[in-house]
């Protein structure tokens, strides 16, 4: 069975859309405001005061969208994607016309075609979001055609239970909900100097005291640090036994990742949220530069 059509469709979620402003987002399904807006969160732009207050002040507010792939018999697959209009244009104007007519079951071939189509301008960044949206929708379609859940098509369940953790600063709520692990967003980065560093340390110390020794703690740094700051903070936080420290460095700086790995070999490092495609993961795994993807 062949692919009949591929199209991007806008989906409307609370607080999204072309006119939605970050400071106006309403999280109607949450008990409390999102941690992204509840206070300072260190990020690559916090060195600039006008964007230091909170992360959504500079990140895109493009509307969410989805991708629908329809087969010749009318069966359809669906997936969601981020970064709205720019990615939707890549889907509709570039990738979709070149995939129509391919087999609905040829997931590997279609993926390879999309990666290769990125050669003129790079297969990472926004192009990778378009690839992912079509790839996921194609897997959804494949599962419907074969009448099997996608996890079975990928080899079946690998485990009976999944390790789950919370993210944010509302620790008392997370403990009330029964989480045994929680990840804190790091509020301050190098631009905040010694005072910010000390506040980061105090946050972890206070949280460890609150949750006790049997709850895992992690720290999300969202690409905000340089190597020196990352090493210094990791050394200060060593007594609090963090399960991992996440995304301390800019994603593309592999030399910095290598330096960090050498200087704090005792600390579990996690990253990969902002790596796109397979190449960065292959590179990092072959060194190895980090412990967790």
Report each predicted region and the residues it spans.
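Active-site phosphate/pyrophosphate- and oxyanion-stabilizing loops and adjacent acidic/basic residues
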Residues: 140, 152, 205, 258, ...
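Conserved, mostly hydrophobic/aromatic
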Residues: 3, 74, 95, 134, ...
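Metal- or metallocofactor-binding catalytic centers and their adjacent structured scaffolds
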Residues: 22, 45, 54-55, 70-145
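Metal-dependent enolase-superfamily TIM-barrel catalytic cores that perform enediolate-based chemistry
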Residues: 155-264
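Structured beta-strand/loop patches that form or line metal/cofactor-binding pockets in enzymes
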Residues: 1-72, 79-82
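Short catalytic-loop micro-motif centered on adjacent basic/acidic residues
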Residues: 78, 217-220, 243-247, 269-271, ...
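Catalytic alpha/beta core domains of metabolic enzymes, predominantly
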Residues: 252-293
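Glycine-rich, aromatic-flanked loop segments that form ligand/cofactor-binding clefts
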Residues: 126-129, 135-169
């Amino acid at each position: 069975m062949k692919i009949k059509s591929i199209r991007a469709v806008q989906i409307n979620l609370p607080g999204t859309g072309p006119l939605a402003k970050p400071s106006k987002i309403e999280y109607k399904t949450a008990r409390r405001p999102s941690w992204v807006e509840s206070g300072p969160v260190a990020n690559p732009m916090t060195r600039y005061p006008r964007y230091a207050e909170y992360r959504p002040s500079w990140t895109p507010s493009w509307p969410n969208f989805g991708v629908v792939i329809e087969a010749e018999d009318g069966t359809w697959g669906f997936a969601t994607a981020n970064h709205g209009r720019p990615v939707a244009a890549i889907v509709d104007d570039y990738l979709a016309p070149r995939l129509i007519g391919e087999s609905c079951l040829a997931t590997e071939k279609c993926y390879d075609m999309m990666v290769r189509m990125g050669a003129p301008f790079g297969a990472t960044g926004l192009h990778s979001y378009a690839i992912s949206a079509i790839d996921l929708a194609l897997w959804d379609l494949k599962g419907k055609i074969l009448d099997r859940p996608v996890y079975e098509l990928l080899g079946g369940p690998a485990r009976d239970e999944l390790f789950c953790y919370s993210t944010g600063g509302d620790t008392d709520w997370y403990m009330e909900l029964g989480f045994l692990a929680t990840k804190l967003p790091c509020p301050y980065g190098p631009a905040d100097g010694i005072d910010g560093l000390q506040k980061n340390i105090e946050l972890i110390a206070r949280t460890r005291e609150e949750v006790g020794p049997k709850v895992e703690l992690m720290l999300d740094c969202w690409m905000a640090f340089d190597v020196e700051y990352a090493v210094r903070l990791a050394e200060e936080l060593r007594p609090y036994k963090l399960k991992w420290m996440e995304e301390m460095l800019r994603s593309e700086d592999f030399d910095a990742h290598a330096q960090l790995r050498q200087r704090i070999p005792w600390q579990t490092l996690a990253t990969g949220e902002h790596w796109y495609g397979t190449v960065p993961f292959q590179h990092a795994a072959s060194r190895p530069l980090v412990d967790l993807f």
